[in-house]
Amino acid sequence: MLLLEEKIHKKVVIVGIPGVGKTSLVTAIVEKISDTGIVVSVQSYGTLMFEEAKNFGVKDRDELRKLPVEKQKELQKNTAENISSLTYDIVFIDTNAFISTTEGFYPGLPNQVIQIIQPTHFIAISARPEEIYNRRMKDETRNRDKISIESIKKELAIQDSMLSTCSVLSGSPMKVILNNEGKIEEAANNVIKAIGV
């Protein structure tokens, strides 16, 4: 437990493939932490990149991953600089560990981004592949590519390898948190414990 005199300043990268329930979980985490008087901000990396990309004529967020990698790098760098200047007690950086591009899997957090943001923690939200599959199939609000249990397992493996690399490069801890069906409260408490709040 932190003493009130201590100044908290954490930058927590939180990732999860579609269907792990990341958005709902982040909402629950923020509510719990905010109730303690700690000032929390959630920054959606993709949304911030999209806002800047509009200046280049990008009209849809899904177009971001279709941009040339060099343009994505530029947008990532600018977004990282904006996030690094934030002074909230805790900043959650909601992002993807990887982006599936026409050139292959591109890291959501390349080294230059890590060096700019200097995250204090990396959290990977996960769930059983079958649960992820079922959640994706029920989600009619998204236009997702065809999926299988095997492709979900591959995505989870890529996410873990990308995020563990980020942990090595930054020297900050990484924790995988399971967000199993009906256990969001438990998952939220596990994230809060992992970041030392």
Give the ranges of each region predicted by the language model.
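ATP-dependent small-molecule kinase phosphotransfer cores
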Residues: 41, 45-107
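Hydrophobic positions on the alpha1 helix immediately C-terminal to the Walker A/P-loop
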Residues: 25
